[in-house]
UniProtKB/Swiss-Prot annotation:
The keyword Kinase does not apply. Expressed by the venom gland. Belongs to the neurotoxin 19 (CSTX) family. 08 (U8-Lctx) subfamily. GO terms for molecular function: toxin activity. The keyword Signal applies. Contains 4 disulfide bonds. Residues 21-26 form a propeptide. It comes from Lycosa singoriensis. Keywords: Disulfide bond, Secreted, Signal, Toxin. It is found in: Secreted. Residues 1-20 form the signal peptide. GO terms for cellular component: extracellular region. It comes from the Eukaryota. This is U8-lycotoxin-Ls1i.
């Protein structure tokens, strides 16, 4: 009985370790890539910055991009 419990705990530890390792190896998103569905996946020097899209005053969507931290983007006409 103790052997079964010990084996179960060891298997659980191995599976947990594999999952953590897979999360750490996940590729980060480079600059200007869309991060709407994955805001935490931008590379370390970038931040996921989101903007609302409007048409005739009504919100029609949202776009998010991996952009440099601390940089301010202004609209050009």
């Amino acid at each position: 009985m103790k052997l079964i419990i010990f084996t179960g705990l060891v298997l659980f530890a191995i599976v947990s370790l594999i999952e953590v390792q897979a999360d750490n190896e996940r590729a980060c998103l480079p600059q200007y890539q869309v991060c709407t569905e994955a805001p935490g996946n931008c590379c370390s020097n970038l931040v996921c910055d989101c903007y609302g899209r409007y048409k005739s005053g009504a919100r029609i969507g949202r776009n998010c991009f991996c952009l440099q931290k601390g940089v301010i983007y202004k609209r050009e006409n």
